[in-house]
A protein has these predicted regions:
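Cytoplasmic membrane-interface "Motif A"-like loop-to-helix N-cap segments
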Residues: 35-49
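Helix-to-loop junctions at the C-terminal end of transmembrane segments
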Residues: 26-39, 128
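A membrane-interface helix-boundary motif in multi-pass transporters
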Residues: 40-43, 124-143
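Short amphipathic helix-loop junctions that connect adjacent transmembrane helices
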Residues: 1-10, 128
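A late C-terminal transmembrane helix in Major Facilitator Superfamily
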Residues: 98-130
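Intracellular juxtamembrane helix-capping segments at the cytosolic ends
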Residues: 82-97
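C-terminal ends and interior cores of transmembrane alpha-helices
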Residues: 50-64
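Multi-pass alpha-helical transporter architecture, strongest
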Residues: 59-63, 89, 133, 138-164
C-alpha cells in the first residue's frame, strides 16, 4: 500500500485473487507438461516463469493509480507462479527411483520452504527496507530469470532418463 496506494480492503482482494488464481494455473501447468510437452517439465516451467517475469515487470513499472493493471498483474503472477513450484517437486519425483520418492519429495519440500519461502521473505524484506522497492523488483526479476535458466537445463529431460 505504500508504493501503489492500495487501501487495506483492495490489498486483501488483490491477495485473495493472487492465491486463487494459482489453482487453475497449477492444473494447467501440470497438464501442459504432461500432454503438450509429453512429460518434459522444463518447457512448461520455463514458459510459466517467463510469464511471471513479464507480469513482475508490468506490476513494477505500472505507476500508482492504475489498480486494475496492478490487480491483473497480481492475478497473472498468482496464476503462473505455483505451476513451476509444483514442477520442481514433480521433477524430483521423476528423476529418482521409486523407492526414494518419499525422500525426494520430503527434501524438495523442506529445502523449498527453508530457502524459498523463509529466505525469500528475509532477503526481500531486507533489500526493500534498506535499498527500496526498485532494487527489490530488480531482485525479483533476476531471480525469475535464473529460474527460467534452471528450467532450460532440464528442457529435454523426462522421467527416469539419465540427467546430464
Amino acid at each position: 500500500s505504500d508504493e501503489k496506494h492500495f487501501d487495506l480492503s483492495a490489498s486483501g482482494w488483490a491477495y485473495f485473487l493472487y492465491e486463487w488464481a494459482g489453482i487453475p494455473g497449477t492444473l494447467l501447468c501440470g497438464y501442459l507438461s504432461d500432454k503438450l510437452f509429453k512429460g518434459r517439465r522444463g518447457p512448461a516451467g520455463f514458459f510459466f516463469m517467463l510469464g511471471v517475469t513479464i507480469f513482475i515487470l508490468i506490476y513494477w513499472l505500472n505507476p500508482p493509480g492504475h489498480a486494475w493493471l496492478d490487480n491483473l498483474s497480481l492475478i497473472g503472477i498468482g496464476f503462473l507462479i505455483y505451476g513451476p513450484v509444483m514442477l520442481i517437486g514433480l521433477q524430483a519425483l521423476d528423476y529418482v527411483p521409486k523407492k526414494a520418492a518419499g525422500t525426494a519429495a520430503g527434501l524438495t519440500g523442506l529445502f523449498g520452504y527453508l530457502f524459498g519461502a523463509v529466505m525469500a521473505n528475509i532477503v526481500l524484506g531486507f533489500v526493500v527496507q534498506h535499498f527500496g522497492w526498485h532494487i527489490g523488483f530488480v531482485l525479483l526479476t533476476v531471480i525469475s530469470i535464473l529460474a527460467m535458466l534452471c528450467f532450460i537445463l532440464t528442457w529435454n529431460k523426462r522421467g527416469q532418463e539419465q540427467i546430464d
